[in-house]
Structures are given as structure tokens and as C-alpha cells.
From Swiss-Prot:
Keywords: ATP-binding, Cytoplasm, Disulfide bond, Nucleotide-binding, RNA-binding, Transferase, tRNA processing, tRNA-binding. Its EC number is 2.8.1.13. It comes from Thermotoga maritima (strain ATCC 43589 / DSM 3109 / JCM 10099 / NBRC 100826 / MSB8). Belongs to the MnmA/TRMU family. This is tRNA-specific 2-thiouridylase MnmA. GO terms for cellular component: cytoplasm. The keyword Membrane does not apply. CDD domains: MnmA_TRMU-like.
Length: 358
């Protein structure tokens, strides 16, 4: 089989490439360039991020070592259009966007995958910790969680188009991270011990404030208020805060522990409250993408953030919205994040959280 592999320059995609070669596939590597090299050179990189010049160098070295052709694909324009600009808009709307999920849908498993398939490849592969398997229950191939639940990345794949699943391969999904590193080490791949990417690739210094400043937006301090309207402190720019956060702002009224309850962008206000007020009985989400056919109402488990606990829930689907009712209240349901829906370890799809229901 002819397989195009997204090669980031990290150990996961390197091992995915290696495993496919071992299986006898005809393989070519594709490496995305999301930003100009100068962008990373000018920034202080506090955490390991993907798509930097060093990643490009590593990807080329991996491909050369494994004896495969590599092509550098310029995705800067589509990346700005589909990831950076929406991220910026959503921050200013008071949302907490998920750029990695948008990148997966529109860039990696959108533009890049189309680019690969249009070259005549049979399938597209990456180093994601997830599995592609045929489901007897749903009568089609589905995405399942990776066996290493600590590294499972299925959440970030919740909104990719369902037809693409038939053409995807995730070789790493049946391994743990430790096993992947061991395979790389035994194969002599030089990135076997390379640090994992930790942050948003286009914010290498980890500062949303600096990102917005680079985009021509200066944040303004504002009031922190209670739901009753009492001013209890000051914030440093509402886009810096997310639901459930309890640090990073200046509280002038002591004696209580405050958590971010919400934001009012048009008034430049952050609303805080007690811990119990940031637990939610449900949510409304919009623009759902379903990988399988689902009824108008069904039971499943829902994940509202990558590291959140899965919550048993009843889901009601109506037109372009989804109403989710949890069995037990869930912490910090955050507008802009992805609600991913599972049947056991099978990913059913995902939607963008519009609002939490208390």
C-alpha cells in the first residue's frame, strides 16, 4: 500500500513511519511548515512546541536515516486562515478555543491529507495515539482510544470529517509511549528521547498576551466581579482567563477562594464565584461532527477537555446543536472547547461547546 506519513520531527511520527516501513508499505514523508522559521528564532521558546526549524531538521534527518523521500509542505496560509485567525477571534469573544483540534480538522487531516491523497496515495498516517478499527456495531471503520490512555489523543480527532477515517492509519495506537520510545531507540532513530511538544505551536513562549500583542491587540485591565455585581478585584485582560481558573488575577477582597465563572467581553469584566458555581449539570454544543450514525437521543460518555474525566450523559441532537445532560455535575464546562462523545472506547464525534448549563 502507498502511504503518506505526516512526519513532525518527533519520536511518535518517526516510529509510525518506521512501523509502516517494517510492514512493507511504500512510504513517503510529509512535513508541514505552519510558520516562517524567523518567527521561532525571534521568540523565547519556554516549552517544546512543534513545527519549529529544529523539528524540520529532525524530520529530514529521520527520513534520510530511514531511506524515505520527504516533502516539505507549506501550510502557512491555510494554518493562519483556519487556526490562528479563529483562535484570535474566539479569544476576543471570551471563549477558550482549542487550536489543536482545529488544526487536525482543517490542516493536518484536511489540507495536508488531501494533498497526500491527490498524489495517488492509498492512505494517510500519523503518529497519533489512537486506533482505527472496523466496528461491527456501527458497520464502518471508527476511531478508538489509544491503548495508552495517558497519551490517548482521540479527543483531538473528534471533529475530523468521517469519510477520512476510512483512509487513515495510526500505527502507534496499540503501543504505550514507553514502548514507542523503546522501538525508536532499538531502531537507532535519533529522536528516541526527544522532549514532547507541550504548548500551542504558534505561541512558543506560552504567552497569550504576547500573541495578541503581536497581532496588534493590547489587553486592558478590568474589574473582577461576583454574580451580584460586587467588584472584588482586577484582571489583566479577560482573554487570559478560562472557566474554573483561580490564579492569575488580583483579588482585593480576601476571605474567599474565587474561581472564574464567566466573562463579559463587551464590558471587559471577569465574573468569579465559589467552587460549586463552576460545576455544570449539562451543556449546549454546536456544529457537531458525527463519525457514525446517532439517534436523536442516546446515552454515552462525554469529555469536555483533554484531561477531564469522562462523564456519563444523555445527548439530544437537534439540527446543528447538541444538548448534553450529565449524570453528575462536571467541573469547568468551557465555551470554545470540544465536547467529545464516546461509546466505550469508540469515538462517536464531537461538537464545540457553546455554553454550560448549571
Amino acid at each position: 500500500m502507498k502511504v503518506g506519513v505526516a512526519l513532525s520531527g518527533g519520536v511518535d511520527s518517526a516510529v509510525a513511519l518506521y512501523l509502516l516501513l517494517k510492514e512493507g508499505h511504500e512510504v513517503k514523508a510529509f512535513h508541514m511548515k505552519t510558520k516562517e522559521d524567523e518567527f521561532f528564532i525571534k521568540k523565547e521558546i519556554k516549552k517544546k512546541v512543534c513545527c519549529s526549524p529544529s523539528d524540520t531538521a529532525d524530520a529530514m534527518r529521520i527520513a534520510h536515516f530511514l531511506g524515505v523521500e520527504i516533502e516539505i509542505v507549506d501550510v502557512k496560509e491555510i494554518f493562519r486562515e483556519k487556526v490562528i485567525e479563529p483562535f484570535k477571534r474566539d479569544l476576543l469573544k471570551g471563549l477558550t478555543p482549542n487550536p489543536c483540534a482545529h488544526c487536525n480538522r482543517f490542516v493536518k487531516f484536511g489540507y495536508l491529507m488531501d494533498y497526500v491523497l491527490n498524489q495517488g496515495f492509498d492512505a494517510f498516517a500519523s503518529g497519533h495515539y489512537a486506533r482505527i478499527e472496523f466496528s461491527e456495531k456501527y458497520g464502518r471503520k471508527v476511531i478508538k482510544k489509544g491503548v495508552d490512555l495517558k497519551k490517548d489523543q482521540s479527543y483531538f480527532l473528534a471533529r475530523i470529517e468521517p469519510w477520512r477515517i476510512e483512509r487513515l492509519i495510526f500505527p502507534n495506537g496499540i503501543y504505550t509511549k514507553e514502548e514507542i520510545r523503546k522501538i525508536a531507540e532499538e531502531a537507532g532513530i535519533h529522536v528516541a528521547k526527544k522532549q514532547e511538544s507541550q504548548d500551542v505551536c504558534f505561541i512558543p513562549d506560552g504567552s497569550i498576551e504576547n500573541f495578541l500583542k503581536d497581532e496588534g491587540i493590547t489587553l486592558k485591565d478590568g474589574d473582577i466581579i461576583t454574580p451580584e455585581g460586587e467588584v472584588v478585584g482586577r484582571h489583566f485582560g479577560y482573554p487570559l482567563y478560562t472557566i474554573g481558573q483561580r490564579k492569575g488575577f488580583k483579588i482585593e477582597k480576601f476571605g474567599r477562594r474565587y474561581y472564574v465563572r464567566g466573562k463579559i467581553p463587551e464590558k471587559n469584566v471577569v465574573v468569579v464565584s465559589d467552587l460549586e458555581d463552576v460545576f455544570f449539570s449539562g451543556l449546549i454544543a454546536e456544529d457537531p461532527v458525527w463519525h457514525v450514525e446517532v439517534p436523536e437521543e442516546f446515552r454515552c460518555v462525554c469529555r469536555v477537555r483533554k484531561k477531564s474525566e469522562e462523564a456519563p450523559a444523555v445527548v439530544k441532537v437537534k439540527d446543528n446543536e447538541v444538548e448534553v445532560s450529565f449524570e453528575k455535575k462536571v467541573f469547568a464546562v468551557t465555551p470554545g472547547q470540544i465536547a467529545a462523545f464516546y461509546d466505550g472506547d469508540t469515538l462517536l464525534g464531537g461538537a464545540i461547546i457553546k455554553e454550560g448549563i448549571r
